[in-house]
Amino acid sequence: MKYKNILFLCLMLFLSASAYPALKDYIYPFSSPSFNEYGTVGLIRMPSARLHEEGTIAFNWAKNDPYTRGSIIAYPFSWLEASWQYTDVDNALYSNVESFSGKQTYKDKGFDVKFKLVSEGSLVPNIALGIRDIAGTGTFAAEYLVASKNIDISSSFNHFNYETTIDLTIG
């Protein structure tokens, strides 16, 4: 029984020591903001106040029934995000006249802009103002004022004076 306990303890120490560098390899390189369904920085359909680096150009493809969206996103300045998207709505016809539409589904295009008003500081969040679906049909039109702040969370495991710390960023 004592042999099994020592073996278990050695295995736990080995796994704890090897997990920390592996987590750093996977968590920190991918800490840039993600794109939402509309092709702008955010989560799912919610925009955030974060922006990618100046000079970034990105392409985004999102499928969330009944919407399929393709987007081109550009960051010409550190304070501006501009995107163009083309949307296919699977459950609606192109026209109210079924004989005119045939099997063609409804399509929509739109242009979005987001302006960063305040950059994140130690106590102040990122603040941005955005307008969605400019020069489109207005189906997905929205105006928003959004704030985003990074929060660091630390977790520790301490056993026999051996400590492993995992740092996560919630955004």
Feature-to-residue mapping (PLM):
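Histidine- and/or cysteine-centered catalytic micro-motif in compact active-site loops
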Residues: 3, 150, 171
